[in-house]
Amino acid sequence: MLIRSAADLRESEVTDKALWLDRRRFLALGAAGALALSGLPAEAGLNTVKGPFSTDEPPTPRKDVTTYNNFYELGVEKSDPAQLAPSYFTKTRPWSVTIAGECAKPGTLGYEDLIKPHRLEDRIYRMRCVEAWSMVIPWVGIPLGEVLKRFEPGSKAKFVEFTTLQDPERLPGQRRSVIDWPYVEGLRIDEAMHPLALLAVGLYGEELLPQNGAPIRLVVPWKYGFKSIKSIVAIRFAETPSRTAWMKAAPREYGFYANVNPAVDHPRWSQGAERRIGEFLKRKTLPFNGYADQVASLYSGMDLAANF
């Protein structure tokens, strides 16, 4: 898969023409009515620049990206998040993120204070779910490493832990013991600092909808989708790795690294192929989801079967 600078892509190349024109019309009108349904402000169209990384594959239709979701906090069925968010997860402002652990500048920042110092970038990434389906999503976000550096992680900061909002009133899926809430994920510090890792605040040029992890989520395109934690409220620098949510729930099936690897099957299904949403035939899964040239060196010398 060719990964090229987004500066080499025109927006009309990335999105089918009708959708591209609809999006332009949508933003021009302010989209007040549609955004009101999601609890987002009318100005939710985002000012962005083209970031340095994008795939040249056509994106998955926006309707599929916003209605076919894994977000167990809102329900375990793919349709639950989009169906339940308008009744429960109706407000994603105000929002704050607490920074703690092995860093010189811990604290709690509001969403705007966390995001405003940075330039929002458009990045078109492949997303591979551990369930053997995939999408291509045009994200809007900020390089994760740029954000983390502001808090000056110390020499003991070997890992970064992320935590999702825990609020069963807004996230009714948390009323069931599907996993040990809140949802927790983690990365090695070098993974978190890699320029592909993204803190996303939007998709298709608009703010994230609640079912997609509003208002701020992680996107790590070379890992299975469950690593890209949604609705983040805490970031902690740590000396040791976290025992993440799915590691606690099913340690034989879900490891800490969760790198996309067609040579290492899930205990219950093959990872050698995937179903791209919107396509009939399966396609071969690529090592590191097609980002091997960028990230394989992070795992030099590691046994990727043992460190799954």
From Swiss-Prot:
Binds 1 Mo-molybdopterin (Mo-MPT) cofactor per subunit. Its cofactor is Mo-molybdopterin. It holds the Pfam family Oxidored_molyb. It is found in: Periplasm. Its EC number is 1.8.5.-. It catalyses: L-methionyl-[protein] + a quinone + H2O = L-methionyl-(S)-S-oxide-[protein] + a quinol; L-methionyl-[protein] + a quinone + H2O = L-methionyl-(R)-S-oxide-[protein] + a quinol. GO terms for cellular component: periplasmic space. Gene3D superfamilies: Oxidoreductase, molybdopterin-binding domain. One of its GO terms (molecular function) is molybdopterin cofactor binding. It is an enzyme of class 1 (oxidoreductase). Predicted to be exported by the Tat system. The position of the signal peptide cleavage has not been experimentally proven. Residues 1-44 form the signal peptide. Mo-molybdopterin binds at N69, Y72, E73, C129, T164, N212, R217, S228, I229, K230. GO terms for biological process: protein repair. Keywords: Metal-binding, Molybdenum, Oxidoreductase, Periplasm, Signal. Part of the MsrPQ system that repairs oxidized periplasmic proteins containing methionine sulfoxide residues (Met-O), using respiratory chain electrons. Thus protects these proteins from oxidative-stress damage caused by reactive species of oxygen and chlorine generated by the host defense mechanisms. MsrPQ is essential for the maintenance of envelope integrity under bleach stress, rescuing a wide series of structurally unrelated periplasmic proteins from methionine oxidation. Belongs to the MsrP family. This is Protein-methionine-sulfoxide reductase catalytic subunit MsrP.
